[in-house]
Amino acid sequence: MGSIGAASMEFCFDVFKELKVHHANDNMLYSPFAILSTLAMVFLGAKDSTRTQINKVVHFDKLPGFGDSIEAQCGTSVNVHSSLRDILNQITKQNDAYSFSLASRLYAQETYTVVPEYLQCVKELYRGGLESVNFQTAADQARGLINAWVESQTNGIIRNILQPSSVDSQTAMVLVNAIAFKGLWEKAFKAEDTQTIPFRVTEQESKPVQMMYQIGSFKVASMASEKMKILELPFASGTMSMLVLLPDDVSGLEQLESIISFEKLTEWTSSSIMEERKVKVYLPRMKMEEKYNLTSLLMAMGITDLFSSSANLSGISSVGSLKISQAVHAAHAEINEAGRDVVGSAEAGVDATEEFRADHPFLFCVKHIETNAILLFGRCVSP
């Protein structure tokens, strides 16, 4: 499964580079893994250059066994699709330690007859699968149905994923992908230690935030040449952790963003660099929700045929004109004090001299520990 982690990490930073262009100074939050798994679902039915483009952009071409025939993909358990399914099952199963809900589905205009093997395959491997709806004569009704499904799958958190103008009678197929996350820390922050303090948005501007605090032993690294620190905070599930990448300077985010990559993050978080130390941690409470037009994002990254009349999705439907008319991604994350074990901050070791104070813009990600797959990636410029 490790190779999926590498693909999701590489894809993560490709997406980040593209999003940065249009969201230079905004908060950002998205799930590389969720987008990747949805594209894997499309990839199963894509042919020719449509398939080649997805392959290249999502780095599927680097994963052994990914391009096998549709029968093999559904019939064998030792391939990448079932590995993706295994990670999806692991992270979305009911769990007291976190809630991680994923809504991912294709909605096709009902006049496109769907290949039965494809339907069976995506149902088996990707729970959302494909639904047929009537965009042609009841587009607004179809939109309401899609929005209601996403809302129910994310426990009421992500609403109105499709805006009124996003579908019409010409819509052929829509891809929706949404993720909502709330985690319990392995070591809780005590609510009474949370204080209102200024978060320095820029050198000139600050805003009051709820800053959580605890002293504990965590994996940290100080990177002098990159002028930043990294902290890893485990979630109670034992399967996920959060990495916080904090520039030394208030205005240091731009420099960090210009050098960060799959290779760099792998190097910085390696066991030879990160070490467990006692540290005073200051982290703001966060509640973030962002929505992105995947159509323009993926087209800018090189997946162009899928959204045009050049699309070849004959593995999904034999009707030649099928393409994706609209693709949307939404992500929501809530980070607060809640955790499994409460460590008394005062007595937890007054000897901690090292400080990790996230009181200015930083990057963060939630990763699946076993595979290194990036489940969420975010930029916090204003909590």
From Swiss-Prot:
Pfam families documented for this protein: Serpin (PF00079)
In chain numbering, where does the site feature Reactive bond homolog fall? Answer: T353, E354
Leader sequence residues? 22-48
Molecular function per GO: serine-type endopeptidase inhibitor activity
Print the keywords alphabetically: Acetylation, Disulfide bond, Glycoprotein, Phosphoprotein, Secreted, Signal
Q: What does the record say about tissue specificity?
A: Major protein of egg white.
Q: What is its main location?
A: secreted
Q: Which PROSITE patterns match?
A: SERPIN
Subcellular compartments: Secreted
Provide the record's note on post-translational modification: The signal sequence is not cleaved. The functional signal for membrane translocation of ovalbumin becomes accessible when the nascent chain is 50 to 60 residues long. The hydrophobic sequence which lies between residues 27 and 43 folds back on the preceding residues to form an amphipathic hairpin structure which is the signal element recognized by the membrane.
- Cysteines joined through disulfide linkages: C74-C121
To which protein family does this belong?
Belongs to the serpin family. Ov-serpin subfamily.
Name of this protein: Ovalbumin
